[in-house]
């Protein structure tokens, strides 16, 4: 079957009438070295990359699926956990949880089982790509909102904090911006049959921009790169730099009680954790954006490299693994969510005559608390 006779932004153009396959590479996310004698998906390099990708996807499904479910369940059950920072973290948890249980199984089948061949139809192809893109932007925007919230709470403690209505508006804004910006990833996603080697076809699933839309694609990518990576990283870096100056290099006037010192240690621990998360975010996503820039704006640098497709998927895998770091840091380190979850399970299976006392002691009411309540370090008694 002859592929479409058009140049694309995410797949190469094949011209079937010719005796041999002619490639006109452009700005591709999933360009396959077509028409070569050797199937790149059968090489040892791709086999090793497939193992790495499979392990990473399995880790994402396990860590993000279970970890974020535990956090969401604990947050819904215990009002003590519901402060503004945790409400923002909940956005990360929800988006990563959806990716872990919805996207990753299909990606495991696409990358590892079928080795870059899609078998689930156009609707699921577009939906999986769209949901994964929305999750990335939600995570980025939520991390940015958390950094700004910490900045206002620590550097400007006397200014009024956000109330519940403002926090709800901010959370809605995080999702609306992410959903709207990611629309092109769904609109331009399609299935395309590509001939990798002679008489061997694979069904490509990804974004395809026609040759006359390359300028729009470049503009869109640069817009997203600035709005969802450079801008947030610079803003978060400035926020945490100013917070660090406030917590470590500013003398606290007056006598410091044990409670004040404990609060300061708590805030320092939280900020160190958040700076570590920012560092992990940059280390995971910078290679992905860097590779994409080189591939889309300087295509001759990579298209001649035999294993550049394998390299791209490994880079993409590293980027996706950032969700595991977020889950481990936010869910298990910061809030001791597992302790709350274990308490919840013990309470659920405890005999009924102990139920009322346990509920009162553990503060299990599901009514909300003010979004301005600050709990930097939560510990069970």
From Swiss-Prot:
Homodimer. Pfam families: 7tm_1. Signal peptide: none annotated. Residues 1-51, 108-133, 190-220, 292-310 are extracellular. Glycans are attached at residues 7, 24. GO terms for molecular function: G protein-coupled receptor activity; neuropeptide Y receptor activity. It comes from the Eukaryota. GO terms for cellular component: plasma membrane. It comes from Mus musculus. Residues 73-86, 155-168, 242-270, 332-381 are cytoplasmic. The chain crosses the membrane at residues 52-72, 87-107, 134-154, 169-189, 221-241, 271-291, 311-331. Keywords: Cell membrane, Disulfide bond, G-protein coupled receptor, Glycoprotein, Membrane, Receptor, Transducer, Transmembrane, Transmembrane helix. Expressed in several regions of the brain, including paraventricular hypothalamic nucleus, dorsal medial hypothalamic nucleus, paratenial thalamic nuclei, paracentral thalamic nucleus, lateral habenular nucleus, lateral septal nucleus, lateral globus pallidus and amygdala. Highest expression seen in paraventricular thalamic nuclei and is also extensively expressed in the suprachiasmatic nucleus. It is a multi-pass membrane protein. Receptor for prokineticin 2. Exclusively coupled to the G(q) subclass of heteromeric G proteins. Activation leads to mobilization of calcium, stimulation of phosphoinositide turnover and activation of p44/p42 mitogen-activated protein kinase. This is Prokineticin receptor 2. Disulfide bonds join 125-205. It is found in: Cell membrane.
């Amino acid at each position: 079957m002859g592929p479409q006779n058009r140049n694309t932004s995410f797949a190469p153009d094949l011209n079937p009438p010719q005796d041999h396959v002619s490639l006109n590479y452009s700005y591709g996310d999933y360009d396959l070295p077509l028409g070569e004698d050797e199937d790149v998906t059968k090489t040892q390099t791709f086999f090793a990359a497939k193992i790495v990708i499979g392990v990473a996807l399995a880790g994402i499904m396990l860590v993000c699926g279970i970890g974020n479910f535990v956090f969401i369940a604990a947050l819904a059950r215990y009002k003590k956990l519901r402060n503004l920072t945790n409400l923002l973290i909940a956005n990360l948890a929800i988006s990563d949880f959806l990716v872990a249980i919805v996207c990753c199984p299909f990606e495991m089948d696409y990358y590892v089982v079928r080795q870059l061949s899609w078998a689930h139809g156009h609707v699921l192809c577009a939906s999986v790509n769209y949901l994964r893109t929305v999750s990335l932007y939600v995570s980025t925007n939520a991390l940015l909102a958390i950094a700004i919230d910490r900045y206002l709470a620590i550097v400007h403690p006397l200014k009024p904090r956000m109330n519940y209505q403002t926090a709800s508006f901010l959370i809605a804004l995080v999702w609306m911006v992410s959903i709207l910006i990611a629309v092109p990833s769904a609109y331009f996603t399609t299935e395309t049959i590509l001939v990798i080697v002679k008489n061997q076809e694979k069904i490509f699933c990804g974004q395809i921009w026609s040759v006359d839309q390359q300028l729009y694609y470049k503009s869109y990518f640069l817009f997203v790169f600035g709005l969802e990576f450079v801008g947030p990283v610079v803003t978060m870096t400035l926020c945490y730099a100013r917070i660090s100056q406030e917590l470590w290099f500013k003398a606290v006037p007056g006598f410091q009680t044990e409670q004040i010192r404990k609060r300061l240690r708590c805030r320092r621990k939280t900020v160190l954790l958040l700076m570590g998360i920012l560092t992990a975010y940059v280390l995971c996503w910078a290679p992905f954006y860097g590779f994409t820039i080189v591939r889309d704006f300087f295509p001759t640098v990579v298209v001649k490299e035999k294993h550049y497709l394998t390299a791209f998927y490994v880079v993409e895998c590293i980027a996706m693994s950032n969700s595991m770091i977020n889950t481990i840091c936010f869910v298990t380190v910061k809030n001791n969510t597992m302790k709350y979850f274990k308490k919840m399970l013990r309470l659920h299976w405890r005999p009924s005559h102990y139920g009322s006392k346990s509920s009162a002691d553990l503060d299990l009411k599901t009514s909300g608390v003010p979004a301005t309540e600050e709990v930097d370090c939560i510990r069970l008694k």
